[in-house]
Amino acid sequence: MKRIFGPALAILLLFVLPLAAQQTGKLVVKADPGRTGVFVDGKYLGPAANFRVARTYNVAAGDHELKLEEPRYEEVVKKITVTANKKTVVAEKLKALPPPKGPFGRLRTESTDKFAAVYVNNKFYGHTDEFSNSSQGLLLPPGEYEVRIEPTSGSPVTQKVKLEADRTVVVK
């Protein structure tokens, strides 16, 4: 019985594993602006591009809701279909919102995951690499905010901050 079970299991795995691998496709989002956040079925995948090169994400085959979000632009939500073992390319130019008026405080973020999502009061604002050094930062009106940094793997960091005009706060 044991001699039959081992080879039967090996044969089964040879057929099942390739079928499981075929259940994903590739998603490429060519968004303008490239720093636009890509969400599939509510889950943040990362920015649309890195240094103007579109990123590719593995996505389960089937119908999905795609949301493109960038705080200075109108968000785009659309239905997409990802086909197993195929590349789905979506191109979108987001419409700019009117620029906000100051004064502003500056929010900086630090994380070991440069593509960790940054949320302010539960709204997506970008990824940590956009706000991570002394010449970068997210400009927000003075006030109190809840900042959440959500890495692609691992636990999110949530911190309440108070921004003052012309001051910088760093969330790690």
Regions found by a protein language model. Give the residues of each.
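Bacterial N-terminal signal peptides that target proteins for export
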Residues: M1-L9
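Bacterial N-terminal signal peptides
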Residues: A8-P18
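Generic low-polarity alpha-helical segments
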Residues: M1-K2, V16, A20
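Short loop/turn and low-complexity linker motifs enriched in small/turn-promoting residues
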Residues: A21-K172
